[in-house]
Swiss-Prot record:
Belongs to the enolase family. Pathway: Carbohydrate degradation; glycolysis; pyruvate from D-glyceraldehyde 3-phosphate: step 4/5. It catalyses: (2R)-2-phosphoglycerate = phosphoenolpyruvate + H2O. InterPro entries: Enolase, Enolase-like_C_sf, Enolase-like_N, Enolase_C, Enolase_CS, Enolase_N. This is Enolase B. One of its GO terms (cellular component) is phosphopyruvate hydratase complex. Its main location: cytoplasm. It is an enzyme of class 4 (lyase). Its cofactor is Mg(2+). The lineage of its organism: Eukaryota, Amoebozoa, Evosea, Eumycetozoa, Dictyostelia. Mg(2+) binds at D243, E296, D323. The gene is enoB. It comes from Dictyostelium discoideum. It is found in: Cytoplasm. HAMAP family: Enolase. Its EC number is 4.2.1.11.
Amino acid sequence: MSIESIKAREILDSRGNPTLEVEVWTSEGMFSAKVPSGASTGIHEAFELRDGDKSRYFGYGVLNAIVNVNNLISPTLKGMRVDNQKAIDDKMIELDGTKNKSKLGSNAIVGVSMAVARAAASIKGVPLYRYISQLAGNSNIRLPVPCFNVINGGKHAGNRLPFQEFMLVPIGAPKFKEALRYGSEVYHSLKEIIKERYGLDATNVGDEGGFAPNLTSPEEALTLLVDAINHSGYQDVIKIGIDSAASEFWNPKTSKYDMDFKNIGSSHLKSSLNSGEQLMSRYLEILKKYPIAFFEDPFGEDDWENHGKITAAIGNKIQIIGDDLLCTNPERIKKAISEKTVNSLLLKINQIGTLTETIEAAKLAKEAGWGCLVSHRSGETDDHFIADLVVGLGTGEIKSGAPCRFERLSKYNRLMKIEEELEKLHRSNGNSFEYAGEEFYHF
């Protein structure tokens, strides 16, 4: 089955910002994908093309990216077989001709790449996750541990919390469906605790469905999570993940971290400025007091030294995950492997721009013995591509926000459906699969 045409249109994401929906048309029908977008983005990510026309959507329109899909990518890929993913992705990279996909826009390229994969899975008569597993050469089909972002801070919320995400990680659940139930129950317990301590208006939610009460310190947020976990009776099965998104409060010129960066004028207050060593000490204290599963982006996106130090200190106990540090970029991943900078990769398909490169990044992580956490973006749609991606790659962990807001739940609900399909296959022909559980960081 060959590509007949490709069309893109402008739609809105979960933050009300423009993004692309891409349609790949073939003789067998139309296959589409919707493109996510981040708020806290790394400077080393593939380039997301925006129009810059302040008279439309404050400059965030994507009409130029749409033109690139319709007028450049479509005629170039016309006639190519949809089941030749690498050739299609390579052709788009060649057509773009830049190191960071800034000519066509990563948002244009990734939408096509995702839609092509859906078309190929259809002609092969297999679910998307099975097709991705074939592309990746992965036979270890398993359901991931979900990481629910239930307290929002950083750039995702209007409070003064410096760290961006505080997550529930139900590693002790027996299956994905139960992990989702555990997360939902703790989420509702947390809502009641926040309402009791901070008032009803403190239960408003942030970009990813998590609560954003007026907290000022990470320890306040962690104590709330522990109380909610204990109240729900899951103290032995749920751990906590933290995404500091430290690049947002790191000054690379001074190498200082402003823990009160959202308080206007705080940059002049010495008490809020931390050195890398001071921030490291805080992480170590947090690890002593709370049931931590991982730290994501604990330091700035080019602070290789302190990432390496924290990995050397506690990398044998928990995951140290690189997001802004690595940007799903194979070259940066190779450097981090060589220098032992982190021990896990955050995998975002739109950070690098094609499915082929995403699979390559995951393979590098696997070969290095790293963990690999598949991730959504803060600006999401109802597209659940990453649910099939995480199962197909078998990475064992996914984060898609809180168990709230449909653009988040679409991924979790898709994973429940996949689990049901795999259970049915297991009963009928013995096909094996598993829930990652406590082995979530090994794949």
